[in-house]
Amino acid sequence: MHEIVVNLHMHTRYSDGSGTHKDIAQAAIKAGLDVIIVTDHNVLVQGLEGYYRAAGRPSPAPPLTQSTLGRTTRVLLLIGQEVHDQDRDPQKNHLLVFNVNRDLSSLADDPQTLINGVRDAGGICFIAHPKDPEAPAFNESDISWEAWDVQNYTGIELWNGPSELKTVIPTKLHGLFYAFFPQFIGHGPMPETLSRWDDLLATGRRIVALGGSDAHAMHMHMGPLHRVIFPYDFHFKAVNTHVILPEPLTGDVATDKKLIYGALSEGHCFVAYDLPASTRGFTFKAKGVGQSAIMGDTLAAKGGVTLQAHVPQPAEIRLLKDGKEVGLWKNSHAATHNATEPGVYRVEVYINYLGQKRGWIYGNPIYVR
């Protein structure tokens, strides 16, 4: 298995971001990312997917070998779409659409029709910022997802950077503070979103969780002050999605795109907050009688299942079954649990950073049936 770091859900000048695709690629290379997925609002930008090198231009990338792994001289830029009904007020029900080669914004007025369109086109889709509260001091509306009766979407964006930001800026003074000290913002997904995820999993559905930066690199003006707040390279070092591939990236765009979206659709990934410390190397696996599984997989409970989690450095590890804690390991590198009952098992990991306990890793479930 091979781990890559993906940052997804970001915006360029084609919608409400401030940068170009080349700007974003440069920031991603600087941050050490492997892949970025751009998702402008209601527009599918064509012709810009590819491997970008430090010069900022797409170019063929050589096959990756052991000697080139870990280098940050190139990044794969893929393009998706964030689709929502622009005639709706407020504009709720945003959907992240990946691996679709045509604009689906004409379907935005009905979320289920949109999801069906994604599936018919061979794509995958995720509910964006499920809980996204208002921020009256900045005239920002609540744009949470409301159409929870929909079916057949791939998953949800468990941790969205700006959604969390909106909870800590009741005044413009708070906003000014966090504009200069963004490292103090991140604590974890919205509690309502975590609970919603567990509730959805309890229905028997497989719901994949992603982490999204929702990066815009916004320009802030307050009197004489001007600042680019939350620049792309900051976002790219914070909330990421680490994806587990069956083989390394090859350098061929079509091949690698298939690998990445295949792994995301299966839930072979985890949500990571890489700002306190790199989460590379986290694993959550299971072994049963003649079977094994990684995050997103299903295996039989008969005969017992051993669940194992490993983290890159000592941290607090929580094991949850059907949304309830069944194991807690403090200041530990690893956790092992023998599961004798069916259930949806997932792991949360917490780390101390800047004097506070913060969410670090949220693994996708292993389904023991």
Question: What label would you give each PLM region?
Answer:
Residues 2-3, 23-24, 203-209, 213-369:
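C-terminal functional module detector
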Residues 2-153, 157-171, 187-199, 203, ...:
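A metal-dependent hydrolase metal-coordination microenvironment
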Residues 17, 182, 186-189, 253-256:
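Residue-level preference for long, well-ordered alpha-helices that form the structural scaffold
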Residues 31, 36, 51-52, 179, ...:
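Short amphipathic alpha-helical patches
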Residues 169-185:
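A solvent-exposed, charged loop/short amphipathic helix patch at secondary-structure junctions
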